[in-house]
Amino acid sequence: MKKIFYIFAVGYFVASCSGLPIQTKLEAYPAMYDDRKPLSVLVIPAINNSTAAEATDYFNVTITEPLSNVGYYTMPVEIVKDIFLKEGIVDSSMIKGLPTTIFKKNFGADAVLFVTINKWDKQYIVLAGNVTVSMDYVMLSTETSEIIWQYSATQTIDTTAESSGFIIADLISTAITTATTDYVPIAKQANFQAFTALPHGGYSDQHGLDGNQSISTTLKDAALDDEG
């Protein structure tokens, strides 16, 4: 049976032990609580820096639901992708340099969310195996271009097979389990966990009430600076 380990940049105990900075949501993301707070978020298809070509597709089908669940209106990512394709934009890295006001004018979005997939890996070493997904999230205001929310999330699933007492059988079982792991629930959980650190939006009954919740902030401010 699979043993699942979640490694997230949340949780007071873990953050305290590792020295990660602890803040409330209001302290970390004040723009999400004042007049600049977004109601609608345009999600850009992920920038894929991993070695898995299919990673963006897994992201596209798992991002909208958890974002909607915390109170934000959003458009399906596949529709957004098709719109940009018709404009000749085939890579999301091309979108990062655009003025954010374009997203307000053309989509009516209050904020735009960029996600970078850093890792989407299967690792298999002798009798041990695991699958790791790691993503960075940066949300910008479409009016001011300022970063109003940012976060990172990593999830690792241990795919090591339980010992049967036969090394060859265990080796084969671990290899098969690692190779056939379903990425969709992994991606969905990573997105869900990231949005636990996102202040609730205007369509949630928790809107404006979660400012005192503690979170750890670990995402690099350079998340949008990799292209200069």
Where are these regions (language model features)?
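Short, surface-exposed coil-to-beta transition loops
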Residues: 131-135
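C-terminal motif of bacterial Sec signal peptides marking the signal peptidase cleavage site
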Residues: 13-16
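C-terminal/domain-edge helix-coil "capping" segments
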Residues: 18-39, 106, 141-228
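N-terminal segment of the mature soluble domain
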Residues: 38-40, 47-114, 146, 150, ...
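N-terminal post-signal-peptidase region of extra-cytosolic proteins
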Residues: 25-29, 94-100, 119-124
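Mid-length scaffold segments of soluble, non-membrane domains
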Residues: 105-120, 126-130
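Positively charged n-region of N-terminal signal peptides that target proteins for export
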Residues: 1-4
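Generic short beta-strand
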Residues: 137-139
